[in-house]
Curated annotation (Swiss-Prot):
Protein name (record): Transgelin-2
Family under the similarity heading: Belongs to the calponin family.
Cross-link Glycyl lysine isopeptide (Lys-Gly) (interchain with G-Cter in SUMO2) residue location(s): K171
Keywords tagged on the record: Acetylation, Isopeptide bond, Methylation, Phosphoprotein, Ubl conjugation
Protein species of origin: Mus musculus (Mouse)
Chain positions with Phosphoserine modification: S11, S163
Modification Phosphothreonine, positions: T180
Residues modified to N6-acetyllysine: K17, K20
UniProt record, GO biological process: epithelial cell differentiation
Keyword Acetylation tagged: yes
Length: 199
C-alpha cells in the first residue's frame, strides 16, 4: 500500500467498505481469462488481493491484455517494458486505461491509476476488467479467448418497427394504469357522511 500510513475513523470505515467489495472468486476468473487471452507467459499470481495487485501493478500484464484484443499490427500500446520505477509503472497503467477507453469502456467504469498502484480500490480494478471482458465478448470479432460465460452478456439493440395502423390502434386501448371499466364499481354507494342503510 505504497507510503500511506494506516487510516483511522471514517477513513478506515470507508476503506473497509471498499475492501469488502473485492470478490475472490471473480479474481480467479479474471486471472484465468488474462492468462488465456494473452497467449504468452504472463505468470499467474497466488490467490489473494495483495498478490493480484502485485501481479498487475507494473502495468505490463494489463498492456499485453489490451493489445491482445486488437488485430495484429493495430495494438494501442506500442512499447511494453517491465520496470521497477514507480512513474514508469504508473505510465503503463495509464496507457492501458486510455486504450480501454478507446476500446469502448465507459469513463465511469474505469479505475484510477492509484486504485491499482497503491491497492486502494482493487474492487474497482475488477469491475474495469469485467467490463473489458464483457465488451470483448459482445464485439464477437474473433479476438476474444476464453469462456464467454465468464462475463455478463451485454445487451444488443433490438428496435421495434410498428406500422401506422398498429400505432393508431394503440391509442384506443385503455392502459392498465387507468383502471378498468369492468368489475366492481361504486354504483349504488351512498354519499360521504350518510348513514349506512342496512335492511
Amino acid at each position: 500500500m505504497a507510503n500511506r500510513g494506516p487510516s483511522y475513523g471514517l477513513s478506515r470505515e470507508v476503506q473497509q467498505k471498499i475492501e469488502k467489495q473485492y470478490d475472490a472468486d471473480l479474481e480467479q476468473i479474471l486471472i484465468q481469462w488474462i492468462t488465456t487471452q494473452c497467449r504468452e507467459d504472463v505468470g499467474q499470481p497466488q490467490p489473494g488481493r495483495e498478490n493480484f495487485q502485485k501481479w498487475l501493478k507494473d502495468g505490463t500484464v494489463l498492456c499485453k491484455l489490451i493489445n491482445s484484443l486488437y488485430p495484429e499490427g493495430q495494438a494501442p500500446v506500442k512499447k511494453i517494458q517491465a520496470s521497477s520505477m514507480a512513474f514508469k509503472q504508473m505510465e503503463q497503467i495509464s496507457q492501458f486505461l486510455q486504450a480501454a477507453e478507446r476500446y469502448g469502456i465507459n469513463t465511469t467504469d474505469i479505475f484510477q491509476t492509484v486504485d491499482l498502484w497503491e491497492g486502494k480500490n482493487m474492487a474497482c480494478v475488477q469491475r474495469t476488467l469485467m467490463n473489458l471482458g464483457g465488451l470483448a465478448v459482445a464485439r464477437d470479432d474473433g479476438l476474444f479467448s476464453g469462456d464467454p460465460n465468464w462475463f455478463p452478456k451485454k445487451s444488443k439493440e433490438n428496435p421495434r418497427n410498428f406500422s401506422d395502423n398498429q400505432l393508431q390502434e394503440g391509442k384506443n386501448v385503455i392502459g392498465l394504469q387507468m383502471g378498468t371499466n369492468r368489475g366492481a364499481s361504486q354504483a349504488g354507494m351512498t354519499g360521504y357522511g350518510m348513514p349506512r342503510q342496512i335492511l
